[in-house]
């Protein structure tokens, strides 16, 4: 293998591959010059990778972005060393009208406050000569333990650039974000931990799973015999308990519904384990799970979360659809907020009636709501107010949890954001431009992007749109498309961008909004491949440089061996020429 080919194989391989290590290490001048051999040894790898990564999305992309508008997409996750890493991705529309998302850097958040995060992000942007004033969108992690910091960061960028709009990325699981918000209420957080514990006990072995289904089958047969169940196709199917997961759609809601459905059967199996468990540990776990399941507070939160998550589930599912209908999705946001608010105004009594009936059916003790409530365990020492059980359940749990849900929905879907997305849907070419609306597009520019068009351009835009609405009917390349991103590319491809340059500018601004993106998730997938348990001591700069090359393979492959050697050579003086 030639020296240049060996270098190529190094930079194009996966970071985890070991096949070519010996070949790479042997890239050197004649063996008699032993000092040069050190050039390609592992201690020089960071330098080599850095010199290549410097050019990466760096690889010429910033030069295209200097005067263009772009969006910053930020996410955070822990690496193998348990360091909090923050991925920075830039979203923009290239000269051909295609959406591009480029991984720019990954930063270790040693002091993850809003101010330090902003300073770090601005440092990356300035390194590539990108102006903060050109930011036209912000997208942040869907489910994050840094929610407060993201809120502050969003506000700080808005101060520098008032048109850097935050938009919830539909690719992020909204349900997980709402669950994370509800878990800010301590007892709700404890509830989900207990739910996971119960499901794990029941699903940890096939024997228990079979017992659970056998008990449920016997229960259904008994109810059918006494005519308490109606039989029909698809009714009364025997299910199982569903695990809570942080990646599956509706997993929390499904898990709650499955436990309510299998509640009696679960209790029966737990009692069997308590009496006949094969080990004391299993008997103790079953006893803890049974006591948890038969407590009033657990039943209250179980049914409360079923109601709340049942309302939000329709919206969560709609946002995950591959073909997005923005207008209908925003309408679902409105109805979801209204239904959640209705729970606050008049849902308590209805919920309490359901819970009371459930407890009576399963012989669960219901406390006297007029009695004084005393917090359990360590919290009792910090309890200052003397409150009743009714106040604790209704105010501290029910109303507080609903308030957290509304706050999260309002944060992700503010009235401003909803109006922005609704107006932008007027550019949607689906169904032969069914929603195309000239007035709405002009309002969009006037209200949300006034700094990107001068007064004369705002006037000219309306006339360009009038021409476009007639022109598109007779142009097959523009007529038979279904997304705004396809429209952007079609305008460039057909040369129509020259005639409708103002429309093209509006489209590019809309496409920078991170309505749908998964690049940050892919970044962390790459991080897990690169920084493994065996390579957990990799420092942040070397990790970032490796990730840039690995994620942006298409650009990295455009480098020639000679350019890599020349860059490496420029690092410092060598005793021998490369």
Model-identified regions with their sequence ranges:
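Alpha-helical structural modules in large enzymes and assemblies
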Residues: 1-578
């Amino acid at each position: 293998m030639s020296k240049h080919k060996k270098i190529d194989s190094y930079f194009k391989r996966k970071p985890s591959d070991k096949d070519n290590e010996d070949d790479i290490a042997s890239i050197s001048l004649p063996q008699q010059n032993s000092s040069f051999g050190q050039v390609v040894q592992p201690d020089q790898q960071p330098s080599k990778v850095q010199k290549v990564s410097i050019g990466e999305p760096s690889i010429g992309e910033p030069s295209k972005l200097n005067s263009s508008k772009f969006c910053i997409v930020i996410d955070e996750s822990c690496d193998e060393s348990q360091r909090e890493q923050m991925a920075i991705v830039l979203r923009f529309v290239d000269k051909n009208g295609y959406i591009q998302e480029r991984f720019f850097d990954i930063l270790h958040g040693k002091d993850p406050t809003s101010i330090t995060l902003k300073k770090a992000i601005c440092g990356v942007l300035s390194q590539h000569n990108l102006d903060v004033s050109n930011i036209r969108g912000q997208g942040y992690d869907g489910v994050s333990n840094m929610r407060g910091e993201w809120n502050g960061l969003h506000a700080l960028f808005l101060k520098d650039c008032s048109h850097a709009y935050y938009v919830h990325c539909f690719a992020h699981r909204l349900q997980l974000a709402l669950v994370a918000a509800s878990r800010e209420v301590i007892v709700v957080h404890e509830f989900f931990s207990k739910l996971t514990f119960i499901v794990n006990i029941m699903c940890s072995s096939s024997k228990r799973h079979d017992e659970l289904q056998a008990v449920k089958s016997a229960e259904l047969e008994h109810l059918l015999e006494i005519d308490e169940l109606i039989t029909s196709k698809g009714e009364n199917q025997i299910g199982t308990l569903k695990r809570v997961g942080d990646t599956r759609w509706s997993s929390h809601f499904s898990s709650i519904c499955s436990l309510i459905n299998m509640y009696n059967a679960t209790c029966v199996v737990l009692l069997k384990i308590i009496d006949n468990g094969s080990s004391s540990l299993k008997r103790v776990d079953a006893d803890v799970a049974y006591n948890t399941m038969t407590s009033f507070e657990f039943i209250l939160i179980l049914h409360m979360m079923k109601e709340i998550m049942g309302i939000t589930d329709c919206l969560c599912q709609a946002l995950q659809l591959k073909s997005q209908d923005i207008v209908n999705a925003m309408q679902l946001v409105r109805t979801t907020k209204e239904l959640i608010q209705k729970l606050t105004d008049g849902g308590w009594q209805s919920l309490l009636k359901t819970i009371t009936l459930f407890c009576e059916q399963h012989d669960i003790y219901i406390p006297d709501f007029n009695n004084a409530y005393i917090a359990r365990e360590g919290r009792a020492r910090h309890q200052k107010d003397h409150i009743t059980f009714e106040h604790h359940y209704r105010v501290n749990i029910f109303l507080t949890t609903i308030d957290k849900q509304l706050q999260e929905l309002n944060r992700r879907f503010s009235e401003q954001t909803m109006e922005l997305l609704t107006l932008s849907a007027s550019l949607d070419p689906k169904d032969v431009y069914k929603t195309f609306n000239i007035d709405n597009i002009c309002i969009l520019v006037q209200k949300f992007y006034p700094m990107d068009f001068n007064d004369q351009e705002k006037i000219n835009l309306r006339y360009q749109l009038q021409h476009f609405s007639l022109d598109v009917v007779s142009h097959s390349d523009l007529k038979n498309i279904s997304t705004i991103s396809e429209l952007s590319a079609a305008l460039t491809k057909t040369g129509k961008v020259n005639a409708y340059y103002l429309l093209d500018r509006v489209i590019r601004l809309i496409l920078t909004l991170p309505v749908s993106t998964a690049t940050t998730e892919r970044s962390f997938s790459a991080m897990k491949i690169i920084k493994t348990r065996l390579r957990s001591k990799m420092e942040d700069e070397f990790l970032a440089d490796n990730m840039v090359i690995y994620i942006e393979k298409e650009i990295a492959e455009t480098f020639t061996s000679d350019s890599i050697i020349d860059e490496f050579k420029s690092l410092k003086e060598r005793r021998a020429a490369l």
